[in-house]
C-alpha cells in the first residue's frame, strides 16, 4: 500500500508561512516563500488563505510596534509579488492597504497613498483590477471622510485624481448620473445687520480690519475706493447668490426666481459701473513672477465684510463669480435626463438668461488681464461641455465598440463576371441590362420587331372614343354653338383626319362632290358615324363585359405558378435544399456556371458536404441576384441529371406557395 499523504494543518502551515515571510522580507526576495508554498501539504486554496492570514498577522505586529512606513510598504510589495506568482489571492494587497490606512495617522497615510499612486499601472492590470477596484474605491472614500476639505485640499485632490486615473471614463460610480448637487457646500456670511461694520467710515474699517505695515503696499498700489458705496444690503445680496449657485433648482420656483433676478441685476450693475484697470492687474502679475509665481488657492470664499472692497477690486474674484453665472445658465437651459418635468423655463426667463449671458461674456472680456482671451476660452469649454451632457443623457454608452459576431456563412469572393454571363448565354438565357427593371422590360420579348408589332403597343383610339364628344355636340338637343364645337379646332381636325384615314371607309370623298371646308367635312362625318355606332347603353355594357374578362384573366395570371416561380430563393430554402443536395453538389456546380477555381475554393473552405452545398448555392445566389429563382435552379438540376432533386424542389415550391 502507498503511504497516505500528510493532512493539512492550519497552525503548522501558518507558522511556516510566517517564518518564510519574515525571511523573504529580510532577504528582499520571494524565493523562500515560493519554496515553503510548494512544500506545505494541502490544496492550493487552503495554502493561499493561510498565507493571506500570515501577511495580515505580520502587518498587525508592525503597526503595533509603530514601525516605519518603509517596513509596512515592503510587506505590501511582497504580497503583490505573491499574487503575481499565484500563491496569494488577488485581494490580499488591497486588504493590507485598507488595514494600514485605517490604523495610521493622516501624516503617514500621505506616504502610504503615494505608494498607491505610483502603482496605479499595477492596479489596472488584469490580475488586480477586477478583484481590487471595489477595495480601492472604498478605501479612498473612507480616507476622504477623515480629511478636512479646507485643510487637506491637496490630499483630497490627489485622491480624486487617482480615482480618475484608475477607473475608465464610463464608470458609473463617478458620473453623477442623477445630476445631484453638493448641497453641503454652504457659504456662511453675516446675516445680522446689527453686527455689520459696513456702516462705519472707510478709514475706521481699514484701521480695525487690516493693519497695513509700512512698505507692504504703497499708495499707488492700493486699490481705488469703489465708486458705488458698499453697504450691508449689497453685501447680503451678493453672498446670497451663492445659495442659488449651490442649488440651481431654486430658480424654477417663482418667488426664488424673482429674488435671484433682483439680486443679480444689482450685482452685475456694480461690475459694469466699477471696471478694473489693466495696469494694476499687470503690476500684481509681475510681482508674482518675481517672487516665484506661487499662487495660493482657497477652496471657500472669504465672506468677511472688511474684504468686500478688496474682493470687488480683484480680477480673479470677479472671474469666479461671472463663471458661476455661466455654469448656472447652462444648467437651466440644458436638457438633463433626470430633471423634473416641472422644471421648465418660461419665455420671459429664457429671454432674460440669453441677454444676461451676453452681458456676462462682455464683462469677462473687459476684465483684465487677457479678458478677451479668457472669455473665448470659457465659451469654448462650456460648448464642449454640451457633448458631455448629451453623453450622460444617453446613459453613458461605452466608447469602445465591440465587434459584432458574423453568423452568416462566408461568401466566396468572385472575380468580375465574364461578358458571356450577361449577354444571354447563361442558364437563364437572359440579357442583363444592369438594372432589375430594365432587364425585365428587355427580356419580355427577345425579338425587337415582334415586340413592336405586339397588340399591347396599339395606342390609337377607336372611332367611338375619339368622336364621342363631337357626336354629343352635334346633337341639336344639346344646343352647342358652332364656335365651341370640337370640329372647329384645327388641332382636333388634324388628328381626326388621321384617325378616319386608318379606321373609317367614309374618309375618301366621291370625286363628283364639291370639296368642303374641314369643319363642314368633319361635321358631315360625325353625323354618319353617329348613325353607324351602337347606342351608349350597348357600348357601356360591352365595356363592362370586357372589364370582367380582363379581371378574370388577371386573376388567372396571378394564380399562375410561373409567376410564383419568378421570386428569388430565400435563405431558408437554400438551407433546406443544401441538406438534400449534400455530396451531389459537385455534379450541379458546372450547370450553375461555376468555374473550376471556385469549386476548388469551396472544397478548401469546408470538409462538411452540406456546408459545401450551402456555399455553392450562396455563391450562385450572389452571382444571379434577382434571377436566382427556383425555376432556374430546377432547370439546372434537370440538365445535370438530378431529376429526383428537381422534382422534390418543385413539390416544395408549390407547397410553400
Swiss-Prot record:
N-acetylmethionine modified-residue sites: 1
Induction of expression: Up-regulated during cell proliferation.
N6-acetyllysine, modified sites: 133, 300
PROSITE patterns attached to this UniProt entry: DEATH_DOMAIN (PS50017)
Residues where Phosphoserine is found: 2, 537, 560
Cross-link (Glycyl lysine isopeptide (Lys-Gly) (interchain with G-Cter in SUMO1)): 595
Tissue: Ubiquitous. Expressed in various cancer cell lines. Expressed at very low levels in normal breast epithelial cells and highly expressed in breast tumors. Expression is strongly associated with an aggressive phenotype of breast tumors and expression correlates with tumor size and the metastatic state of the tumor progression.
CDD domains with a match to the protein in the record: Death_NMPP84
A single cellular component GO annotation: nuclear speck
Keywords annotated in UniProt: Acetylation, Apoptosis, Cytoplasm, Deafness, Disease variant, DNA-binding, Isopeptide bond, mRNA processing, mRNA splicing, mRNA transport, Non-syndromic deafness, Nucleus, Phosphoprotein, RNA-binding, Transcription, Transcription regulation, Transport, Ubl conjugation
Modified sites of kind Phosphothreonine: 4, 542
Alphabetized PANTHER family for the sequence: THO COMPLEX SUBUNIT 1 (PTHR13265:SF2)
Oligomer and partners: Component of the THO subcomplex, which is composed of THOC1, THOC2, THOC3, THOC5, THOC6 and THOC7. The THO subcomplex interacts with DDX39B to form the THO-DDX39B complex which multimerizes into a 28-subunit tetrameric assembly. Component of the transcription/export (TREX) complex at least composed of ALYREF/THOC4, DDX39B, SARNP/CIP29, CHTOP and the THO subcomplex; in the complex interacts with THOC2, THOC5 and THOC7. TREX seems to have a dynamic structure involving ATP-dependent remodeling. Binds to the hypophosphorylated form of RB1. Interacts with RNA polymerase II. Interacts with LUZP4.
Similarity comment text for this entry: Belongs to the THOC1 family.
Protein name: THO complex subunit 1
Amino acid at each position: 500500500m502507498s503511504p497516505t499523504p500528510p493532512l493539512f494543518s492550519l497552525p503548522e502551515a501558518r507558522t511556516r508561512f510566517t517564518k518564510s515571510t519574515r525571511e523573504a522580507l529580510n532577504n528582499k526576495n520571494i524565493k523562500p516563500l515560493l519554496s515553503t508554498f510548494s512544500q506545505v501539504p494541502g490544496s492550493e486554496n487552503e495554502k493561499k488563505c493561510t498565507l493571506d492570514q500570515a501577511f495580515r498577522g505580520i502587518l498587525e505586529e508592525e503597526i503595533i510596534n509603530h514601525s516605519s512606513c518603509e517596513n509596512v510598504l515592503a510587506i505590501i510589495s511582497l504580497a503583490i509579488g505573491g499574487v503575481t506568482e499565484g500563491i496569494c489571492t488577488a485581494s490580499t494587497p488591497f486588504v493590507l492597504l485598507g488595514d494600514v490606512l485605517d490604523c495610521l495617522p493622516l501624516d503617514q497615510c500621505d506616504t502610504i497613498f503615494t505608494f498607491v499612486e505610483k502603482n496605479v499601472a499595477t492596479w489596472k492590470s488584469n490580475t488586480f483590477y477586477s478583484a481590487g477596484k471595489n477595495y480601492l474605491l472604498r478605501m479612498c472614500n473612507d480616507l476622504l471622510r477623515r480629511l478636512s476639505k479646507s485643510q487637506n485640499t491637496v490630499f483630497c485632490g490627489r485622491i480624486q485624481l487617482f480615482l480618475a486615473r484608475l477607473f475608465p471614463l464610463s464608470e458609473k460610480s463617478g458620473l453623477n448620473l442623477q445630476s445631484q448637487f453638493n448641497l453641503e457646500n454652504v457659504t456662511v456670511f453675516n446675516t445680522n445687520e446689527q453686527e455689520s461694520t459696513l456702516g462705519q467710515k472707510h478709514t475706521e474699517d481699514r484701521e480695525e480690519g487690516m493693519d497695513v505695515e509700512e512698505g507692504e503696499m504703497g499708495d499707488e498700489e492700493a486699490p481705488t475706493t469703489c465708486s458705488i458705496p458698499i453697504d450691508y444690503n449689497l453685501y447680503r445680496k451678493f453672498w446670497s447668490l451663492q445659495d442659488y449657485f449651490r442649488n440651481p433648482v431654486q430658480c424654477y420656483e417663482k418667488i426664488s426666481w424673482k429674488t435671484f433676478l433682483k439680486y443679480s441685476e444689482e450685482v452685475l450693475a456694480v461690475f459694469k459701473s466699477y471696471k478694473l484697470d489693466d495696469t494694476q492687474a499687470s503690476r500684481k502679475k509681475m510681482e508674482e513672477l518675481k517672487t516665484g509665481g506661487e499662487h495660493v488657492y482657497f477652496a471657500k470664499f472669504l465672506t468677511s465684510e472688511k474684504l468686500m472692497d478688496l474682493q470687488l477690486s480683484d480680477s480673479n474674484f470677479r472671474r469666479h463669480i461671472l463663471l458661476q453665472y455661466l455654469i448656472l445658465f447652462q444648467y437651466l437651459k440644458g436638457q438633463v435626463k433626470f430633471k423634473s418635468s416641472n422644471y421648465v423655463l418660461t419665455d420671459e426667463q429664457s429671454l432674460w438668461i440669453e441677454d444676461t449671458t451676453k452681458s456676462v461674456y462682455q464683462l469677462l472680456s473687459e476684465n483684465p488681464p487677457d479678458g478677451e482671451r479668457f472669455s473665448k476660452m470659457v465659451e469654448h469649454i462650456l460648448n464642449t461641455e454640451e457633448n458631455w451632457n448629451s453623453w450622460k443623457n444617453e446613459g453613458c454608452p461605452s466608447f469602445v465598440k465591440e465587434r459584432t459576431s458574423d453568423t452568416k456563412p462566408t461568401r466566396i469572393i468572385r472575380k468580375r463576371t465574364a461578358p458571356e454571363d450577361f449577354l444571354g448565354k447563361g442558364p437563364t438565357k437572359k440579357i442583363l441590362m444592369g438594372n432589375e427593371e430594365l432587364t425585365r422590360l428587355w427580356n419580355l420579348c427577345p425579338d425587337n420587331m415582334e415586340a413592336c408589332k405586339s397588340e399591347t403597343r396599339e395606342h390609337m383610339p377607336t372611332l367611338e372614343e375619339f368622336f364621342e364628344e363631337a357626336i354629343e355636340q352635334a346633337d341639336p338637343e344639346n344646343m352647342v354653338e358652332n364656335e365651341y364645337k370640337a370640329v372647329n379646332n384645327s388641332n382636333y381636325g388634324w388628328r381626326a383626319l388621321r384617325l378616319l384615314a386608318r379606321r373609317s371607309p367614309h374618309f375618301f370623298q366621291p370625286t363628283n362632290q364639291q370639296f368642303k371646308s374641314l369643319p363642314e367635312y368633319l361635321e358631315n362625318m360625325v353625323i354618319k358615324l353617329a348613325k353607324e355606332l351602337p347606342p351608349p347603353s350597348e357600348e357601356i355594357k360591352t365595356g363592362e363585359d370586357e372589364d370582367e374578362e380582363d379581371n378574370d384573366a388577371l386573376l388567372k395570371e396571378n394564380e399562375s405558378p410561373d409567376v410564383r416561380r419568378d421570386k428569388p430563393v430565400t435563405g431558408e430554402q437554400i438551407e433546406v435544399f443544401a441538406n438534400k443536395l449534400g455530396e451531389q453538389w459537385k455534379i450541379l456546380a458546372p450547370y450553375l456556371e461555376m468555374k473550376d477555381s471556385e469549386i476548388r475554393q469551396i472544397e478548401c473552405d469546408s470538409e462538411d458536404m452540406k456546408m459545401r452545398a450551402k456555399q455553392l448555392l450562396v455563391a450562385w445566389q450572389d452571382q444571379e441576384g434577382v434571377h436566382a429563382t427556383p425555376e432556374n435552379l430546377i432547370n439546372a438540376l434537370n440538365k445535370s441529371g438530378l431529376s429526383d432533386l428537381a422534382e422534390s424542389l418543385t413539390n416544395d415550391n408549390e407547397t410553400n406557395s
